[in-house]
């Protein structure tokens, strides 16, 4: 690290702010540092069979000189007649016109093809947006023997704030997600809804928001799942306007004030001043109850907690990226304070500080909260109960995530023990060949289950007290996944260095990283922290070689292989290919009898189901695409891993698998993440770990552990929320 000179095996890139050397260096070909990106977004430029561009292409030349006006050779007859000269000139002119015509046709065809591709891309994006729209009719909810209606239970008590539905089933386009499940949501509690991806957690939130699962009419429900639509309204106004009642009362008060006096001070509508005054007083009382005087201040406080500076708060919402607009949607929900707030992965678009602020804010939430999250620390801090979606059912556990884990493990052992006894008895009954004996074993098991369920309910236990009808014991099915990165070959240090590097974007005068002096070797563990927009991803791009420093020097070993993961890489996958085709194209040198089977085995290790291996990547979920990217990184056999928000598309089991794999990996790891637990796992060894703080255009080392850095942030945030 620092200004240490590179050894002979290292490649050095020097960049000066000005001069011939800087110009010369900028023209050098930039080496790719990630094998997985080699063809990520390349297109096949070969014309397709039967395409218009091929049918109108120029005829094949018989010689490389065809169509080129050449000077006459020394052997040509100098005594050519004028007629021959004119004929020759005419032939040259005709050939030139034909060539220009061919070029013109080719240009037109190229433009047509580009226009066609643009239209196809727009159509694909439109289809994608259409597919993302929620189709209410695609979901079927059956409660007991009746199907739910969108408006909820007409007989709901106006004072009821709890939601209790027994024995309901949910299916989506024919796929059963929940079977004979029961839900119990008590007012004032904060629930964490957990389970593997694709099992129906987000669907359950949507059904509650749509009231297809009956919700008492007096309970207002708000689900935060989509970013706010960008327009000219400022971020602050967008948050305040989320309270429609407040906005309406303000408009009524303003209109009444205007109508109460004309240009001469008399009432335009002819109403008595006393009546107008009474109406205004009533409106002001209602506005005071809604906290109108402090509305903007409260909205500003929420936005600040989510990372918006004062300048950002007055910017138009249309000027923000999707991630920031998602924060505005979250701020709107927190400002409105619905009776039932539903959050689906709220931390995905937040930096670490914003996540810690949201934890502190939600811990003070007095109403009901149901949140889907794969962040263990977030669930431990915020939640008072856990709902586990497992095996098409909902299991309730008191306490936070740690409490759930201990309860879950105990439950798993008990269930497997009961199954082993039942399975042994059933096998013995089958050996007798007596079907009646088999039915007796099954009935006895059901009776025992019903007795235990009744006993648990009478004791007031929260685990499955509203459970489905008793069934015979089944083998407990756990979802598990294992990630693995191969052992890297040893390289002589230093592997990668940035020495006195500065960087700025040509079109971003407000952004600059200055005097960056960092390095990475085998075994190095780095967590990059700092607010969104400070330059964390830019720093990773500089380390990867995807950006060239404006000033300073980058050194890297010539044999260095870097594995790069970004939350946006899943969008760069070639959607028309299958995962197997994609990986074989990037990594053709596979060992074994069958290259395809070798690739499928690797995909399986990273948790991609076998039926997705040969499906187009476009049909995969975000989490499944992430698994394809991680598989590709593993196949590139990297020495250093650069990971930018790797948990956004992963469920909890996959995050744990990633943490285990990084713990075993002997190469270098540089991590940007809002997941505190993952950072703690990666930076567990203090001697090998570093915390780089990117803020105010600089990269500084935090003199302590990640836990100490986190505690400092939490103290600051608590003081802010207490104000």
From Swiss-Prot:
- Listed binding positions for ATP are 195-202, 530-537
Say if the entry is tagged with keyword Nucleotide-binding: yes
Query: What Pfam families does its record include?
Result: ABC_tran (PF00005)
The signal peptide, as residue positions, is none
Disulfide bonds, paired cysteine numbers = none
Q: Which SUPFAM superfamilies match?
A: P-loop containing nucleoside triphosphate hydrolases (SSF52540)
Keywords from the UniProt entry: ATP-binding, Nucleotide-binding, Repeat, Transport
Q: What is this protein called?
A: ABC transporter F family member 4
